[in-house]
């Protein structure tokens, strides 16, 4: 539930920094900035369960203090580090370009002061990744047009496009993407390999993916390797890509490790609300590996075979069947079989190309009634047998 805890078991980042660097090298307050190498300022935005923030901006008093610190630091040619003590994303555009580093600790708990101090002094190499997206502007948020709603109710219109899925679908560049996070070292992710480039999902086959990760920096650190999957051309509405796996590994300078993932049918399935089922579509999937949703280092293609409700049937739209040379040839043959010319489809393709083929065929005028039923059923049987793996 929701509660508020008052305790004397908390840590001050200032006191912990003094323990690490010594009292003589640690100063508190803006008036002491001239004696330091860098200014570290903590800003906060309240947030809690059971209520919403009115926006993404930091409180006015926090922004004012932050701006004073930045102005004075620039005058004295000092570095500025901002520690974000927040519940979720905030608008950083007002100051991000004017500071040297941002450490987002969210709500770290009673040892948060010590954890932050140890990171700032290099005793701990940060390795966290954002579990959400920091938008570049509040208006970029998926819910911007719906919040705060009316009469105490908010309409959630994002559907499946929540978080990074929304920003990628709308091609909106965020301030900091889902999965983003820096370290005191650098990593190189390369050489994505699949043990097979085809997968029969109906036979419960799995595909094993491996990728090389190398620490190309000067200190030991941890990297979170993220696996995303994209259905390149799907029938069902889907995000551009979705996170399907991740592994966190520690590497010494120059060290390289092989990170492995297993791709299963479940990773390729999406829920169809119309039919109320999880479905795995046949076709081309792209396997993507990187260290954030917008930093993809390598990719590989996987062809998947699977029988599903999206296989060719009387429900399939005319355009999809006509775009496939195999089913187009079958359709033209069927049109001829009922005594019609293929040009009769011209108007349908221009005005009603997204109609189900079953509706199109039933509405064709002057089709031979004796041949129609048998020819149509044979057509449906033949298109249902087509392998859509390579479509």
Question: What are the residue ranges of the model-derived segments?
Answer:
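C-terminal non-catalytic regions of proteins with extracellular/luminal or membrane-system context
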Residues: 1-391
């Amino acid at each position: 539930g929701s509660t508020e805890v008052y305790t004397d078991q908390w840590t001050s980042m200032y006191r912990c920094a003094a323990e690490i660097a010594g009292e003589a090298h640690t100063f508190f307050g803006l008036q002491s900035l001239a004696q330091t190498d860098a200014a570290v300022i903590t800003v906060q935005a309240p947030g809690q369960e059971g209520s919403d923030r009115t926006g993404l901006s930091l409180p006015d008093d926090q922004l004012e203090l932050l701006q004073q610190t930045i102005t004075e630091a620039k005058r004295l040619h000092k570095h500025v580090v901002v520690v974000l003590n927040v519940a979720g994303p905030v608008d950083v555009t007002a100051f991000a370009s004017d500071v040297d580093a941002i450490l987002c600790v969210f709500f770290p708990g009673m040892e948060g002061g010590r954890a932050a101090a140890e990171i700032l002094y290099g005793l701990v190499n940060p390795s966290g990744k954002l579990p959400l997206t920091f938008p570049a502007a509040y208006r970029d948020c998926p819910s911007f047009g719906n919040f705060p709603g009316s009469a105490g109710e908010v309409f959630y219109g994002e559907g499946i496009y929540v978080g990074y899925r929304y920003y990628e679908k709308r091609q909106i560049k965020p301030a900091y993407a889902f999965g983003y996070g820096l370290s005191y070292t650098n990593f190189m992710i390369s050489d994505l390999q699949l043990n097979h480039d085809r997968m029969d999902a109906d036979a419960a086959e799995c595909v094993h993916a491996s990728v090389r990760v190398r620490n190309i920096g000067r200190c030991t650190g941890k990297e979170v390797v993220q696996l995303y999957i994209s259905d390149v051309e799907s029938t069902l509405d889907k995000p551009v890509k979705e996170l399907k796996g991740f592994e966190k590994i520690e590497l010494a300078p120059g060290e390289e490790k092989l990170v492995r993932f297993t791709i299963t049918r479940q990773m390729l399935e999406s829920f169809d609300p119309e039919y109320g089922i999880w479905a795995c579509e046949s076709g081309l999937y792209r396997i993507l590996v990187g260290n954030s949703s917008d930093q993809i280092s390598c990719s590989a293609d996987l062809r998947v075979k699977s029988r599903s409700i999206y296989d060719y049937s009387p429900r399939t739209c005319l355009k999809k069947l006509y775009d496939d040379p195999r089913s187009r040839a079958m359709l033209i043959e069927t049109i001829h079989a009922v005594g019609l010319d293929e040009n009769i489809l011209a108007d349908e393709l221009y005005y009603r190309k997204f109609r189900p083929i079953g509706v199109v065929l039933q509405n064709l005028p002057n089709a031979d009634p004796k041949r129609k039923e048998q020819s149509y059923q044979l057509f449906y049987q033949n298109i249902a047998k087509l392998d859509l793996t390579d479509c």
